Amino acid sequence: DVLHNLKIFFGYEQFRTYEGEALQEQAVQAAVKGKSLLAIFPTGGGKSLTFQLPALMSGHSVHGLTVVISPLQSLMKDQVDNLADRGITDAVTINGLLDPITRALSIQRVQNGEASLLYIAPEMLRSKTIEKILMARHVVRFVIDEAHCFSSWGQDFRVDYLYIGKFIRKYQQKKGCKEPIPVSCFTATAKQKVVQDIRAVSYTH
C-alpha cells in the first residue's frame, strides 16, 4: 500500500495535490504498477518523492535498483543528502565532483546492494565502470529528470540525453530482459513539440 509506505519512509499521511489533481499519487501508483510514464510537474511540485518512494519500495521488496539520470550534479547531491537527513541511506550519487574515496565508496554501495537509488549524469552512462555495476544489479526503472533536455526545440538541449535510449536498449539486450524496463520521464515543460520529442527518444512509447 503506497500510503502505508509514504508514512514509513517520509512520515507523510497523504500525497500532495495540485489544483485538485492528485498528480503525486497518480505518478507513484503508475510506477508501482510497473508502467512507463511521462509526468509534467511544476517546479517545486514534489516531483522527487514520486520516483523516490517506488524506488525505496522496490529496493526493499525485490532488491531492485532505480537509476535516476539528471543533468544537475549539485541537485543530485542535494537529493541524496535530503534523504540521508530523513534517515534514508539507500541513495547514492556517482559523478565527477566526488573525490576518489567517496566515489569508490559509492560504487561499492551499489555493487553490494546497499543502494536502491543511483543518481548519475547522462554522460556517466558511457562509463565502463557504470555499465559494469549496472549489469550486476537488477535495474527496475530508469528515471529521466529534466526530460526536456531531449528536445532540440528546447534551449536546454543536451546531446548526452540522446544516448540514454541507446544505453537502455543495449542494457536490456545484454541482460536478456523479456519485458522492457520501465522508464519515467519528468519535466516542467508542457510544450507539445518538446513532449513529442521526449516520447520519440526516451523509450517511453
Where are these regions (language model features)?
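Conserved pre-motif I regulatory segment
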Residues: 1-40
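Conserved small/polar residues in nucleotide/adenosyl-binding loops
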Residues: 204-205
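SF2 helicase catalytic motif II
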Residues: 133-172
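Conserved helicase ATPase motor motifs in RecA-like P-loop NTPase domains
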Residues: 42-43, 148-149, 168-193
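Conserved helix-turn-beta segment of the N-terminal RecA-like "Helicase ATP-binding" lobe
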Residues: 77-97, 109
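Conserved SF1/SF2 helicase motif Ia
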Residues: 56-79, 87
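Walker A/P-loop NTP-binding motif
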Residues: 32, 48-61
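Conserved helix/coil segment N-terminal to the catalytic DExD/H
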Residues: 100-141
